[in-house]
């Protein structure tokens, strides 16, 4: 594997959306520090990692109340003490709820408000910079959910509103109630279905794009070796793309990317991340990591330059026909943007 391109470039700033929010051109996804990707990591190490990121210029920090649940927000709350809060753009999310042991989605006004209050308390802040609806509640008209978020903006509890895993039509309806600043979606070399409808809609409306899992949930760092190293507590073990029947074919994609990275003098993960950075000045990827060396490597991806021909070559490695398996297990796939239409506003009876 090639040596990493050095993290020499300063992390530039970018406007996210058209409502006034400015962030670092690369953010830090914090989920894996506390949840879903194996056991929680040691808290002092993660606080040190967050402080290292901020010092390096990666200031958009991304969390959610469901990570843990709650423990990731508490971790960030500790990391933000001592004047760090003023140096970062803090993004968190609401909407995924575990009730009676079952995973559900809620966007009713009372829940939205209670979730926001809970996040403010855990994070130890008086305002959240960017507050996303993590998943769309298909029982509640999107206008109702955004209406409550609009009130939270007016009260100063949140500054900007975001959506995650929302369809183009849902984004349009939401944006008509209150301007949406950012849409978070999975976008990487092997997850490109958002390009058809959602990305153009965001661009038409002046909405920023935040790309989660830009490294294919770590796949573009190590290929099939990653899957072999996963702990039993790692939810990636259940992702169809990582199942044995799909892995062999998907591993070929990684090997091609790896070979091109060697030619470019960077790592495969830097190459995959650079591809996302090259999608436009309105795109902010938020790779997650738990290691300072990987964070430095991710920052180094900002200095990897790709020609249009190289972009096309990379894309040819991971065409829709080449990628095997869905990006989520079936139980979680029913809350992605493909299943995010909400009832008409006229159907809503306030409870």
Swiss-Prot record:
<dbReference type="InterPro" id="IPR036812">
    <property type="entry name" value="NADP_OxRdtase_dom_sf"/>
</dbReference>
<dbReference type="InterPro" id="IPR050791">
    <property type="entry name" value="Aldo-Keto_reductase"/>
</dbReference>
<protein>
    <recommendedName>
        <fullName>Probable aldo-keto reductase 2</fullName>
        <ecNumber>1.1.1.-</ecNumber>
    </recommendedName>
</protein>
<feature type="active site" description="Proton donor">
    <location>
        <position position="67"/>
    </location>
</feature>
<keyword id="KW-0560">Oxidoreductase</keyword>
<feature type="binding site">
    <location>
        <begin position="213"/>
        <end position="223"/>
    </location>
    <ligand>
        <name>NADP(+)</name>
    </ligand>
</feature>
<dbReference type="GO" id="GO:0005737">
    <property type="term" value="C:cytoplasm"/>
</dbReference>
<feature type="compositionally biased region" description="Polar residues">
    <location>
        <begin position="332"/>
        <end position="351"/>
    </location>
</feature>
<comment type="similarity">
    <text>Belongs to the aldo/keto reductase family.</text>
</comment>
<dbReference type="InterPro" id="IPR023210">
    <property type="entry name" value="NADP_OxRdtase_dom"/>
</dbReference>
<dbReference type="Pfam" id="PF00248">
    <property type="entry name" value="Aldo_ket_red"/>
</dbReference>
<keyword id="KW-0521">NADP</keyword>
<dbReference type="GO" id="GO:0004033">
    <property type="term" value="F:aldo-keto reductase (NADPH) activity"/>
</dbReference>
<feature type="binding site">
    <location>
        <position position="134"/>
    </location>
    <ligand>
        <name>substrate</name>
    </ligand>
</feature>
<feature type="region of interest" description="Disordered">
    <location>
        <begin position="317"/>
        <end position="351"/>
    </location>
</feature>
């Amino acid at each position: 594997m090639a040596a990493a391109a050095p993290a020499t470039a300063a992390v530039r700033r970018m406007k996210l959306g058209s409502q006034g929010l400015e962030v670092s051109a690369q953010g830090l996804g914090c989920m894996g520090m506390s949840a879903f990707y194996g056991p929680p990591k040691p808290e002092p190490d993660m606080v040190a990692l967050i402080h290292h990121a901020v010092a390096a210029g990666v200031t958009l920090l991304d969390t959610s109340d469901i990570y843990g649940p709650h423990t990731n927000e508490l971790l960030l709350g500790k990391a933000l003490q001592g004047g760090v809060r003023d140096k970062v753009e803090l993004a968190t999310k609401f909407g995924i709820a575990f009730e009676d042991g079952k995973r559900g989605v809620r966007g009713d006004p009372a829940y939205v408000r209670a979730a926001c209050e809970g996040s403010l308390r855990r994070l130890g802040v008086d305002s959240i910079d960017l507050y996303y609806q993590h998943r769309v509640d298909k029982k509640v008209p999107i206008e109702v959910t955004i209406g409550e978020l609009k009130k939270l903006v007016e009260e100063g509890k949140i500054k900007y509103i975001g959506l995650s895993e929302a369809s183009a039509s849902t984004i349009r309806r939401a944006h008509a109630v209150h301007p949406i600043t950012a849409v978070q979606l999975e976008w990487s070399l092997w997850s490109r279905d958002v390009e058809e409808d959602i990305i153009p809609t965001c661009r038409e409306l002046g909405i920023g794009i935040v790309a989660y899992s830009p490294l294919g949930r770590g796949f573009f760092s190590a290929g099939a070796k990653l899957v072999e190293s996963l702990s039993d507590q790692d939810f990636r073990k259940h992702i169809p793309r990582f199942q044995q029947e799909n892995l062999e074919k998907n591993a070929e994609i990684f090997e091609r990317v790896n070979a091109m990275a060697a030619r470019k003098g960077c790592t495969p993960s830097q190459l995959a991340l650079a591809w996302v950075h090259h999608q436009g000045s309105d795109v902010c990827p938020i790779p997650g990591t738990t290691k300072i060396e990987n964070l430095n490597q991710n920052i180094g991806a900002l200095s990897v330059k790709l020609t249009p021909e190289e972009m096309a070559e990379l894309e040819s490695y991971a065409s829709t026909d080449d990628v095997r398996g869905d990006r989520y297990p079936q139980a979680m796939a029913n809350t992605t943007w493909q299943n995010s239409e909400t009832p008409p506003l006229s159907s809503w009876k306030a409870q």
